[in-house]
Amino acid sequence: MTDISVSKIRNFCIIAHIDHGKSTLADRLLQDTGTVKQRDMQDQFLDSMDLERERGITIKLQAARMKYKAKDSQEYILNLIDTPGHVDFSYEVSRSLQACEGALLVVDASQGVEAQTLANVYLALENNLEIIPVLNKVDLPGADAEKIKQEIEEIIGLDTSNAINCSAKTGEGIEDILEAVVSRIPHPQNEVKSLTKALIFDSYYDPYRGVIVYFRVIAGSINKKDKILLMASKKNYELDEIGIMAPDEKQVNELHAGEVGYLAASIKSVADARVGDTITLFNSPAKDPLPGYKTANPMVFCGLFPTDADQYPDLRESLEKLQLSDAALKYEPETSSAMGFGFRCGFLGLLHMEIVQERLEREYDLDLIVTAPSVIYKVNLNDQEDILIDNPSTIPDPQSRESIEEPYVKMEIYSPNEFNGTLMGLCQERRGVFIDMKYITTDRVTLIYEIPLAEVVTDFFDQMKSRTQGYASMEYHLIGYRKNDLVRLDVLINSERADPLTSIVHKDKAYGIGRGLVEKLKELIPKQQFKIPIQASIGSRIIASESISALRKDVLSKCYGGDISRKKKLLKKQAKGKKRMKAMGKVDVPQEAFMAVLKLNQ
C-alpha cells in the first residue's frame, strides 16, 4: 500500500446543502469504483447513525478510500472525506476541508444555491481548494441546469463552463465526476521527508478499542510502531493499529504524506483527541502545530431532566458515554425545586441539541424533559465586573447589576422574492436590525439582518420554513454582544419561583409573554384544596396574575334548616383549615404544564 506515489493521490470532499443529494452521490462513487460491493450497499452508506439516515443529514464525518482506474490507464487513490452540511457543525466542516485539496460543489438542479452551500463554499475558498461545480438531480422534471449554472456564476463567482451535469440516482455523469477529480484536483504536496504532522479531522468512540481517530498525514509518515504526541492536549500514546478506510477499516503498516487513514491507541475520550489537533511523533516532534485549531464553544444551553427521578444515574452515565463521542457537548449537574435533579447542557446550536436529546432517548432509552433553550448572557455588575451566565434563573437581581448584554448574529436568508415581506416581518418581530437586501437573480433574494441569538434559537427556523413554504434557507454567525433593555421574567406559583420557567426577555415583550404564561398555567395546573395564585414578575413587580380557585367540599350539606351560627362555625372551621393548607401545601405542577409552557415560551 505504501508504494503509491503522492502524484496518484487525490483528497476531496463534497459540499452541499441539506437534501441536495450529497450522500447519494457518495454512495454512487463508492459503487462505481467497486469500493463497496453491490450486495453490501445500502442507501447513505457513509451515514453510520440510524438517526442520520432518518433525518437525511450527515452529523459525524466519515471517510472512504477508493481505487479508480482512469482513462489514462493509471490507477489513482481517491480519498473522499464526507462533511456535515449543517451550520451547527461548521467547525467540523472547516477541519475536513483542511484535509483536502479539492471539493465537489453539489447543487440541486431544481432548487439552486442555498445558504449552507454558500457558507461552506467560502470556507473551501479560504482553504484554497479547487472547486468542481456539479449539478445533481438533472433527471428531475423541474431541473433547469443552465439557469442554476448562471446562478452559481453570479452568486459565488465560479466559472461553470466545465460544470458537470449528473444524477446520482440514475448514475448519469458519475464517470465524468471521477475523471474531473483525477484531472482537476491537485495532488498533495510531497513532504514525505519532513517532520511528521497529521491533522485530526474526525474521531469516534469504540467501546472496545477506545477512540478511533481519522487523520490526514500532511507531512512525514506514521508507522504503526511509532509513539505519537497530540500537540494541543499534550498527551502521548503508543499506537495499537493504523489503517485505511476502504470504507471498512483495513490495517496497514505505514501511511505517508498525502494519505488519509485511521489510528487506534487506547485513547480514553474524544476530548483527548479533538478535531483539528495535530499528531506528531513523540521522539521527533514537529515545532509548530497545524494552524486553525480551536475548541468548539457551546452557544445554546438548556436543562435536561429525567421524567422519572430514578433515571438520574442513567442520564449521567449516558451523557458521559455521549461525551466520549461528542466533544462539543458540555454538561454540569443542576437541581431545581420543580424538576428535581438533572443537568445543564451546552450545545453548538439547535440541531445539535435536538440530536443529543434524540440520541439520549433512543440509544439509552431515557424519557427527558428539556427546558427552554437559552444563550450566554453577559451581565455587567455594579462593581464594573462582567460575568457570563447561561442559566436565566441565576442572573443577579436588578439592584446589583447595571445592564445585560446579549449575543447577536449576522443572518443571511436566501429565498424566492415573493416571500420577502413575510420574512422581513418575521425578522422585525424577532428584534432584527435590517442591514441589506440583494437580488441574486431576478426571482431570488438575500436578506441580511443582525438579530439577537436568543430570538433565533427558539423556533425561528420552523417559522421561516412555514412562512415560505419551505423555500427559504438561512445561515448565521456570531458577531458579538450588545446592550439591550433586558429583564428577568420569573413565574411564581403559590408565591414560589418556578426556576425552569424563568426567562430573559426584552422589556417591551415582557408583559405579553408574562400574560401568556400565567394564562397557560391556569389551564394546566389542576385545582387544589386551596386557592393558588400564579404570577409573572420582573424583580419585585408583578406584571400579570391569575389564580386557580379552590376545590370546595360542601360542609353545610348536613345542616337542614336550624341556626345560622352553626353554619357560620362550620364555614369558619373550613376556612381555617384551608388557610393552614395554603401555608403548608405544595403545588405539584404536572410535567405537561412545563412542556406546554416551554413551547409557549418559545
From Swiss-Prot:
Chain sites annotated for binding GTP: 19-24, 136-139
Catalytic activity, reaction form: GTP + H2O = GDP + phosphate + H(+)
GO BP, sorted A to Z: positive regulation of translation; translation
SMART domains tied to this protein: EFG_C
UniProt-listed Enzyme Commission number(s): 3.6.5.n1
Topology of the protein relative to the lipid bilayer: Peripheral membrane protein
Keyword Membrane tagged: yes
GO molecular function: GTP binding; GTPase activity; ribosome binding
Alphabetized Gene3D superfamilies for the sequence: 3.30.70.240, Elongation factor 4, C-terminal domain, Elongation Factor G (Translational Gtpase), domain 3, P-loop containing nucleotide triphosphate hydrolases, Translation factors
Record function comment: Required for accurate and efficient protein synthesis under certain stress conditions. May act as a fidelity factor of the translation reaction, by catalyzing a one-codon backward translocation of tRNAs on improperly translocated ribosomes. Back-translocation proceeds from a post-translocation (POST) complex to a pre-translocation (PRE) complex, thus giving elongation factor G a second chance to translocate the tRNAs correctly. Binds to ribosomes in a GTP-dependent manner.
Protein name (database record): Elongation factor 4
Species of origin: Prochlorococcus marinus subsp. pastoris (strain CCMP1986 / NIES-2087 / MED4)
Gene: lepA
